[in-house]
A protein has these predicted regions:
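Structural alpha-beta junctions
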Residues: 82-97, 161-170
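Short hydrophobic segments within beta-strands
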Residues: 62-64, 143, 172-174
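A cross-taxonomic marker for long C-terminal extensions/tails that follow the last structured domain
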Residues: 132-170
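PRPP-dependent phosphoribosyltransferase catalytic core
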Residues: 2-18, 154-186
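Well-ordered, non-membrane alpha-helical segments in soluble/globular domains
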Residues: 29-48, 73-87, 153-158
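Short, glycine/charge-rich flexible loops or terminal/linker lids adjacent to PRPP-binding catalytic cores
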Residues: 87-139, 154
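Active-site-facing substrate-recognition patch
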Residues: 1-60, 66-70, 107-132, 186
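Gly/Ser/Thr-rich loops at beta-strand to alpha-helix junctions
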Residues: 65-74, 146-154
Length: 186
C-alpha cells in the first residue's frame, strides 16, 4: 500500500476549512495548536484506518525531513504519535516506533513560493538518508502538516524506490491543497 490521507481539503483560497489564525500560530511554534491539530488529525485518520492500524505487527512513524531545527510538523508528528501509542496500548498492541528521513538541505530559497516543478528541481539537489533495514516490511506513517504541491511525497517515494524499500506507506497530512489554481504560497 502506498497512499495518502488528509484531514482538510483546500478547494478555494477564500474558504479555508480550518482556522488560518490557529494554523499561523502553529507554524510559528505554538505547541498547544500542534497538540490540538494532532488530536483532530488522529481522530479523523483512525475513523478511516483504525481497523488497518490494529492489524499491524509494527508501525513506524516518520516526521517530515528537516535539517537540524525541528519544524512545526515535527511537533504535530510527536503529538500524533502520542495519540497513536495511547490507542495501541489500550488495544494491547506494541507502541509505534519513530524513524527519521535525514536530509542535507542545499538551498536557502523561500520554498513556499515555488510550484511543483520548481520544488522538485530544488530539493533534488538535497541528499537524503533513510534506514531502509529499519522500516522495510513495516507499516509506515509519514506525517507532515500540509501537502501543497506533492513534491515532498514525490521525493520520499523516489527515495523508497531507489532503496527498494518494501512496506506499506501512508502519507498523512493535516491539510492538502486540492485546487491547482491556487498558488503554492497560500
Amino acid at each position: 500500500m502506498n497512499t495518502s490521507f488528509s484531514l482538510h481539503k483546500i478547494h478555494s483560497q477564500d474558504n479555508c476549512p480550518f482556522s488560518e489564525e490557529e494554523y499561523s500560530w502553529f507554524k510559528f511554534g505554538d505547541k498547544q495548536f500542534a497538540k490540538e491539530f494532532a488530536k483532530q488529525l488522529f481522530d479523523a485518520f483512525m475513523k478511516e484506518y483504525g481497523d488497518i492500524i490494529l492489524q499491524q505487527e509494527q508501525i513506524i512513524i516518520l516526521p517530515s525531513p528537516y535539517l537540524s531545527i525541528p519544524t512545526a510538523s515535527n511537533f504535530l508528528c510527536s503529538y500524533f504519535k502520542e495519540e497513536l501509542n495511547n490507542f495501541l496500548f489500550s488495544n494491547h498492541k506494541k507502541a509505534a516506533l519513530e524513524s527519521k528521513i535525514y536530509r542535507n538541505q542545499t538551498y536557502v530559497t523561500d520554498y513556499g513560493n515555488l510550484d511543483f516543478e520548481e520544488r522538485v528541481k530544488l530539493i533534488s539537489n538535497d541528499t537524503y538518508y533513510i534506514d531502509r533495514n529499519f522500516i522495510s516490511g513495516k507499516f509506515c506513517i509519514l506525517l507532515d502538516d500540509i501537502k501543497i504541491t506533492g513534491s515532498h511525497e514525490h521525493t520520499v517515494n523516489k527515495i523508497l524506490n531507489e532503496y527498494n524499500v518494501d512496506g506499506d506507506f501512508i502519507f498523512v497530512y493535516f491539510a492538502e491543497l486540492i485546487s491547482k489554481d491556487i498558488h503554492p504560497k497560500i
